[in-house]
Amino acid sequence: MRHLLISALLMAVAVTAAANTLAASAERTRSDRASATQTVRISDLQAGKRFDGIGAVNGGGATSVLLKDYPEPQRSQIMDLVYKPKFGASVSAILVEVPGDGNSTQGSMPSHSHYRGDANFLRGYIWWVMREAQQRNPLLALDATAWSAPAWVGNFWSQDMADYYLAWLQGLREVHGLELDALGCHNEKGWSGDFAKMLRKAMNERGFANVKLHGFGNWGQSKMDFVRAMQEDKELADALDAVCAHTYSEIPLSAEQRAAIEAMGKPIWNSEDHVYLKGFDCLISIVKCFNENYIISGATRIINWYDIAGVYPLEPYSCDPAMVLAREPWSGHYSVRESLWGYAHYGQFSTVGWQYVDQGCLKLDGGGSIITLRNPATDDFSIIIETMEANSVQNLEVRLPKGLSRQPLCVWRSNAQQQFVRQPDVNQKSGRIRLTLEPNTVYSLSTTTGQQHGTFADIPAPAPFPIPYSDDFEHYEQPAAWGYLPHYLADLIGAFEIVEAPKHPGLCLRQTVGDHTLSWAPEWHHYTIIGDSAWTDYEVSADVYLNPQDEAAVMGRLCDVGSGYGIWAKGYYLKLDDQGTCKLVITRGKLNQKELIGDKEQQEAILARKDVEIGGEYTLSEAKVSGISPLQWHNLRLRFDGDQITGYVDGIEVVKATSDHYSKGMAGLMAPLQEHRISTPYFDNLKINPVGRTKAVTAQRLTVEPLYRTN
C-alpha cells in the first residue's frame, strides 16, 4: 500500500509539472505573439454595418429622481457631462423607461395614464430628461420601452398596451416636441409576435411609421427564441425593424443566431448590457463590452444600464453602473465616476450613422480588441482599442486603403492612473499606423477633432441631508411645472404626487395608484423615502387624510429597500386605518431572504447580501384610537429615541415598544398594500426633527428651477 501511495504521489507530481510546463509554454507563446507586430489589413470599406450608437438607460426605476432637484448650474453641468457632444461621455443614444407606476429596480416613475382615459404628459421627469439630452445633442437617438404598466392595461400584450404606447408617443410629440427614434415592445417579459404586429400596425396608422420597433429585450439563454418565429412569419419579420436582447457581454449570440438575423437584413441591438464594476475596471470593461458586442454578436446599438445615479445610497445599484453620482441636491454636490470616460472613448469619436469597418474589428492576438468606424459622408475614421486581457506590451500596425483620411490622428488614452488624457498625435505613413499598446489600457484614435476632457471647477462640497426638515407642499404653486413631484422624496413603488388638498385650501401629497400595477418587479406597500441613512434618533410626522378603507403610515429607520427585484423594506412604520386601528410595525424585508428571484445579477446580489434574517412584518404594538373616521385629517408621529419607539396620533401617545433591531435609517411615507387594492391617502406637513443622538444639520434651501413651462 505504501508503494502504491508513493507511486501515486510521484505520478501526481509529474502531472502537475507537465501542466505547469504547458501553462508556461502557452504564456510564452502569447508573449511571443504580443512582442511580434500584429497587422490589421483593411481593404474593403463597404463591409460593415451601420453604427446605431452607444449609450445608457435612464430608467429601469427612478434612476435620476434626485437629479431633478439640483440647483443650477449643477443640474445643467451633470447633463452636459453625459450628453453634450465632445465634452464628457457624449453618448449617441439614450433608452428611457416609459413610466408605468410599478417598481422597476430603483423605484417607480408615475405613468402618464394612471387609469383608462387619464392623459397627463407633464407627469414625472422623464420628458425633461429627454428634452435636455436632445437639446445638447440634436443627433441623439431617443429610444424607449416599458418595464411596468398601470392595472387598466390588463396585460402587456394587449391592444390597450399598444394604445398606451401610442398615447405616450403622441404626448412626447405634441407637448414636448420630441420624436422617438425607436420603441421596444417590452422589457424582460417574454415575447409576443402578435403584439409586435399589432403595435407596428397601430404606429403606422397613427403617424409613427418612422419610429423603429425592436423586440424583445429579454435576458438568459432563451432570449433569442423568437428569431425562428420571425423566419417563419414574414409579417412578424416586417414588424420588427431591429432584433434586440440584453447582456450579450454575458451570453453572446451564437454564430447561428447572428447569421439568421443578418439573413433577414435586421440590425442587432443590445438594449441593456451590464457592467457592475468600480473605478478603471468599470471604464475598460465598458469599452470591451462595446467592442465585443459588435465583434462577437454583431450588435450595432449597445445600451448599458444606467446613466445618472440620482438615487439615495440606500437603494440597490446606487453607485457602480452609473457615470455620475447625483444624490445630494440639497448641497449641489455630485461626482464623476471613471466609467463616464469609457463612454467617451466611443461617444467623442463617433456618431449614429457612421459605419463599422469589419476588417478593422477583431480580437487582438496579444489580448484585447479593436474597432474601426468611419464616417461614410467624409473620409474621417476612428479606432477604439482596449487591452484589458493583455499581459504585456503589444505592437500593432493598421494598414488603411484609399478612401480614408491621411490626416494625423489624435490619440486619447485611459489607464488605471489617468483617464481620457490626450497623447501625441500619430502620423500615418503611406496609409500605415504603427502603435505600441500597453496592457490594461484604452485608446481612441481619430482624424476628427474637438475632443476634450470636460470638467467643472465649481462643484459644491458634500453635506448631510438637513435636519430639521419640513415640507408643506405650498411652494409648488404650479404642480405640473415640477412634474407633480416634490423635492427629495424618492418613490420606491407607486406615485406620490402634489395635488389639491381635500377639506382645506392649498396643496398636499397623495399616493395616486390605487390598483395593482403590471409591475416588472414584485409589489409591496407603496412608499417613498427621504433623508439620511445615518439618522438614529428622530421624529417623523405627517398629517394624513384617509379615504374609506384607506390606511396610511409614516416610516423610520429604513435601512434596506431590497435587492432591486422587489423593494421590501427593513425598518419601522406607524400605520393608521380609517376606523382608528393604529399599529407600530417592524418590517424585516422579504419573507424568505434566501429566495433567488429576478435576473442573474439580481440573484447574485441576493447571494452577496448573505442575509439570514427572518423576514416579514411583525406588529410590535397595537391600539384602537377613538374619533377616527374616513375623510378627516389626522396627524401621525413616529418617534425614535434609543431603543424606545413611540407612536402618536393627533399628539397623543397611543402605541409604544422597545426594539433595538434597527438603530438608524431614513424616513418615509407609506400607502399600504391591501389584498385587492392599494390605499390612496393624502399627506401634508411632512416634518422630521432630531431627537437625542441625532444632531441638527442646518443648510440653506437652494433655488431649484421647474422642469416644465406651464403657461
Stretch-by-stretch model annotation:
Residues 270-368:
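Aromatic/acidic polysaccharide-binding cleft in carbohydrate-active enzymes
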Residues 656-688:
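Flexible glycan-contacting loops in extracellular carbohydrate-active proteins
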Residues 632-646:
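Localized edge beta-strand/strand-to-loop motifs within extracellular or lumenal beta-rich domains
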Residues 495, 503-506, 511-592:
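Secretory/extracellular carbohydrate-interaction modules
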Residues 32-181, 185, 193-201:
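N-terminal catalytic cores of secreted or lumenal carbohydrate-active enzymes
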Residues 160-182, 187-276:
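Active-site neighborhood of glycoside hydrolase catalytic domains
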Residues 589-635:
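Short, aromatic/His-centered strand-loop micro-motif at the edge of beta-sheets
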Residues 359-405:
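Carbohydrate-binding surface patches
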